[in-house]
Amino acid sequence: MRYLTAGESHGPQLTAIIEGLPSQLPLGTSDINPWLRKRQGGYGRGRRMVIETDEAQILSGVRAGRTTGAPVTLVIANKDHRNWTEIMSPEPGGEPRKKALTAARPGHADLTGGIKYRHKDLRDVLERASARETAARVAVGAVALKLLSELGVEGANYVASLGGIETRAPFSWDQLDAIEASDLRTPDADAAAQMRERIDQAKKDGDTLGGILEVRFRGLPVGLGSYVHWDRKLDGRIAQACLSVQAMKGVEIGRAFENAVQPGSRVHDAVYYREGTYVRDTNSAGGLEAGMTNGEELIVRVAMKPIATLMKPLPTVNVVTHEAADAARERSDTTAVPAAGVILQCVIGWVLAEAMLEKFGGDTLPELQERVQAARAYAQAY
């Protein structure tokens, strides 16, 4: 499978094309739009989330509620585009340059992207570099999550920490309803209250906050990925996918950083054979060994830096005059940490769905289901 996204933050729409989905997968906008709503949620978001009420349209590849095997085209309209039609016009003219953005924002793509692509109007950089693009990736990921659910795989995400405040309650699959009900995507009510206070203070200060997200998947068959070649190792592919999301700066699988300071005897997960199957009583590895799923729960933690657009701008330079300036201010969030967990579950879900198809193949969902079931039976009897 593969996909491509296109579109700018304030352009008419975001577009995604997915190629390689098996046919006969039940799919409709009701499988995608709830994920888009989750992405827009969370305490600390800005006014853009009020303007946009994201809904996907399926333009190809699905008929009568099932994929056909043809490329699937998804479109998400940018409602705010009506306020930007002249500035974002693709036609030659003076209006776009009248409001040129020339004060590069530290921490953003502005300066480096301007140098790379030779833009002096930095809007030509930020419009595509914007995290608005993640709406398209969530739509794509929602399709992948639908495929995984048809193969018996379930995912979850929550906020492990925000602004230095940690979720102290250990994760449990029984807490999913509480996580979904929380505007901070944490089951820890005390931590959520402290996070809100921290966000409110940051907003008053014109500042932003980052955090750590945890994403989990259960029900994965043994052997997704490979140890044979570097580019087929699933942990590397998951890390790349996570770090490709705007503002994500670090990835941990299992208890990686804690494990780094422990002796091996306290790190590696002992294997036992009980009741006719292989079991581990611990999961320090986070469900991946030597680049392959081992049948345990996949656990991925991702560090998100604070959003780079500040309401109290940092010092920078005007790229036209080279004079000192305050960084440009764009409408932004105080934090998007809760939404980031949703995005990360979707992008990791894509990697896992891709790995499923690579290992098991099949032009149709029934073929794929049969092969996954056979692989699970083999691993059970091994």
From Swiss-Prot:
Record's protein name: Chorismate synthase
Organism: Deinococcus geothermalis (strain DSM 11300 / CIP 105573 / AG-3a)
Cofactor-binding details, from the entry: Reduced FMN (FMNH(2)).
Residue positions binding NADP(+): 39, 45
Alphabetical list of Pfam families matching this protein: Chorismate_synt
Binding partners and assembly: Homotetramer.
Pathway: Metabolic intermediate biosynthesis; chorismate biosynthesis; chorismate from D-erythrose 4-phosphate and phosphoenolpyruvate: step 7/7
InterPro entries: Chorismate_synth (IPR000453), Chorismate_synth_AroC_sf (IPR035904), Chorismate_synthase_CS (IPR020541)
GO BP, sorted A to Z: amino acid biosynthetic process; aromatic amino acid family biosynthetic process; chorismate biosynthetic process
Enzyme Commission identifier(s): 4.2.3.5
Gene name linked to the record: aroC
Cited function: This reaction introduces a second double bond into the aromatic ring system.
Cofactor: FMNH2
